Amino acid sequence: MSFTNNTSSVDTSLSSSASSSIPASSSSAAASTSLSSSSVIPSSSSSMLSSSSATAISSSSSSSPLSSSSFTSPASSSFITSLVSSSSQQSSSSSASLTSSSSATLTSSSSASPTSSSSSHALSSSSSSLVASSSSSGMSSSSLSHSSSVPSSSSSYHSSSMTTSGLSSSASIVSSTYRDGPSIITLVSTSYVSEVVTPTTTNNWNSSSSFTSSTSSTPISSSYSSSGTLPSKSNKSSNHVGVVVGCSVAIPVGVVLILIGLGIFLWKRHQRSKRIKAERMQEVEEYGFNPNQPSNFRSPNRAPSTNNRYRGWNGSPTPAAGNNTNGRPVAPRPSAGAGGANPPAASQPGLLGGSSNSAGPIAAATAAGVGADASDAANTGGSFTRPQGARMVRPIGNPPDLSASNEAEATMPPSNGSNFSEGLSASPFESGPAVGAAGAAAEAAEHSGSGSDSYPEGPLATIPESDSESMASDLAGESSYGSRAALSSRSQSNLLSPTSTGASNQPNYSPFADNPSSSNVSIPRSSSEARRLNLF
């Protein structure tokens, strides 16, 4: 590695009339000129040195004490020559050479007469020469020039008094070029220095310019300090952010989830109600069962009852055969087309094994008018037989009171447990059978005198249907005892007339009449009778 320093002789041409002092004045700072081949050194200078005979340069490095020098024309030539031949190492420390930040005092004395002379100094170098001059505000600048000439002129003038203070910053750029084999390497380094300059000048002809430069090695700090930080958020602001996040995110999400759950619940309940309704409708269609219908409602699809309107306990219109050996008397059931409802004489209660030719009971039955068929059989003297299926059994219960007085029987309405006893007398089981001619005559007198109905019916003639209309009609008073007595007396007079020859010309008010004649059913007595006669 070899450094190349190209220096040339410096020719100094001085033209002056005599040797006189050089008044070097500066308005803001001292002048410092450095000439180097490989380095650039800034200096705080605001004006160029001017002199007619010599150039005065004074500098001190690294806060050296103030120095003052005055050079004449012969000495200036050798000094400038030494400056030109100096290398880059002169930038650190030298007694009479370059400084970037120093405090110096330049003093010079001039002659009394203000004469001015101009001189030209031609400084030539193969490398570069730098002249740095700063303005009056204290800001210094550095410039690098290669192969340049620095003219200098001096004039004698009256210096003014000035005091200036300011912040100055200088930049130093050092460039080193060396050869390493076939390649050329150039190193460039930059440093920044801040300084406070306070120049002062005096107001006299022998001007002495002085300034003090204090240098600090710290770099220039930026206007925004690195230690400065933004104000941190307080706990209140962080809590506020949490509240905002909760109100904007958590609450809407929760509300949406609640609405979704409520919708699912309502939908399931609706589906359940629809399923239950469909199952109930299917039950009604398949089984004919409607749970919403009252239990006493009679369905219109119900099968009609038999012609004799008898259903019985076991649902069969054919009751069991009569058997009175077990203490249960046999109740009659008239056949179809029969005019009376009484059983034949052979099956009368108490006439066990009696025949139709028996004297007493048959006569009593005939005198009492018990049954048109029985009276016809007794009058004609022939036998009267019923089909075996036309018998029914009296329901289980207490036997009738045989010791009841005639007055009580005459005054009490018949109570045989049948709803179809309108105009008909009580069952033959309510009063005991007459025994002998006296009993028959008394019974005949009772029937004829009291006007009671001699057309009795059995207690099991029929079991009425649960019909609200018939119940209402019965409760309305249509089946009162007075109307019964009037109707029974009329029917008795018709039945016991001596001109009656058969059942065909007798009025038939029996509920068992399946084919009544038109003449016999011209005027129905009540709504219940009309229903029994199938007139509705």
Curated annotation (Swiss-Prot):
Residue span of region Disordered: 1-76, 204-237, 287-354, 373-536
Regions crossing the membrane: 247-267, 351-371
Top-rank taxon, per record: Eukaryota
GO biological process terms on file: positive regulation of cell integrity MAPK cascade
Biased composition (Polar residues): 290-326, 403-424, 480-509
Keywords: Membrane, Transmembrane, Transmembrane helix
Compositional bias ranges of the Low complexity kind: 7-76, 204-234, 327-350, 430-454, 517-527
Location in or out of the cell: Membrane
A GO cellular component annotation in the UniProt record: plasma membrane
Membrane topology listed for this record: Multi-pass membrane protein
Chief subcellular location: membrane
Protein name (record): Uncharacterized serine-rich protein C11G7.01
Native species: Schizosaccharomyces pombe (strain 972 / ATCC 24843) (Fission yeast)
